[in-house]
């Protein structure tokens, strides 16, 4: 026999009806199951840090954290983010694998921070996707070449206090500069005194800084070291020669001053007998 809702009500006793009323509806059943399955806690999505927000720009997922007072790369960035803006913060370094959880990231803005250190694996996992990277207006004096190996990107390196060494020349062989930013790559106070204030691209066009795998500044240091070592070696040889000659003269003078010992009579008679 088919039981309709009206017939069910007619057969429902007060105790049974009270029990059925206490059962959760279908809309509340799923959260209840989630609570049971997660040990009593309801999982919640990661909330962006204060000052950050997610937006869709030109149909692409964008995560903006500009001027958010960040001192480290934040967590909670959606893994489908294509454009990430971390500019105008207080980031001092980028650790290894900082963005490897963002498999479709195409554009990364790290400009106007306090970046002084870049890990050689800072952009690990972005080799096939990253296209634009902004590192301008930071405190970068040198960057590891391996950080850019495999990346097909346009990069802005202007407004940093570069050492203008072999490492920078190698980086520029790995990447393409954003048009119009090359003149902003200027040698900082930590560079060789004769390079400070000069545009690096002009220097790199006139001088090979990586001859035989060594930078020009490194070669100058090596030459100075060799000259110093040569000077010390010459002084040591001169001292040894002087010491030998002085000892030889002293030996001669000692021999001349040595007294002649008299021959005893017994020795003379023995000598005569032998003869």
Curated annotation (Swiss-Prot):
Keywords: Glycoprotein, Leucine-rich repeat, Membrane, Repeat, Signal, Transmembrane, Transmembrane helix. The keyword Repeat applies. It is found in: Membrane. Glycans are attached at residue 156. The chain crosses the membrane at residues 225-245. SMART domains: LRR_TYP. Belongs to the LRRC3 family. This is Leucine-rich repeat-containing protein 3C.
């Amino acid at each position: 026999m088919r039981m309709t809702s009206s017939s069910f009500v007619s057969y429902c006793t007060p105790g049974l009806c009270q029990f059925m009323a206490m059962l959760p509806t279908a809309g509340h059943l799923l959260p209840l199951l989630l609570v049971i399955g997660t040990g009593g806690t309801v999982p919640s999505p990661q909330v962006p840090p204060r000052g950050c927000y997610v937006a869709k720009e030109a149909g692409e997922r964008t995560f903006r954290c500009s001027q958010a007072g960040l001192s480290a790369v934040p967590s909670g960035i959606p893994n489908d983010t294509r454009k990430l803006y971390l500019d105008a913060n207080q980031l001092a370094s980028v650790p290894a694998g900082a963005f490897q959880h963002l498999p479709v990231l195409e554009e990364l803005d790290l400009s106007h921070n306090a970046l002084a250190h870049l890990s050689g694996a800072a952009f690990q996992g972005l080799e096939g996707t990253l296209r634009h990277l902004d590192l301008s207006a930071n405190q970068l004096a040198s960057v590891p070449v391996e950080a850019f190996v495999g990346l097909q990107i346009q990069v802005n390196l202007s407004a940093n206090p570069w050492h203008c060494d072999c490492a920078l020349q190698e980086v520029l062989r790995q990447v393409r500069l954003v048009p119009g930013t090359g003149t902003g790559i200027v040698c900082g106070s930590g560079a060789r005194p004769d390079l400070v204030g000069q545009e690096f691209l002009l220097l790199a066009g006139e001088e090979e800084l990586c001859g035989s795998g060594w930078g020009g500044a490194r070669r100058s240091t090596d030459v100075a070291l060799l000259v110093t070592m040569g000077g010390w070696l010459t002084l040591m040889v001169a001292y040894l020669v002087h010491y030998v000659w002085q000892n030889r003269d002293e030996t001669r003078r000692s021999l001349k001053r040595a007294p002649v010992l008299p021959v005893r009579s017994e020795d003379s008679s023995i000598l005569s007998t032998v003869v």
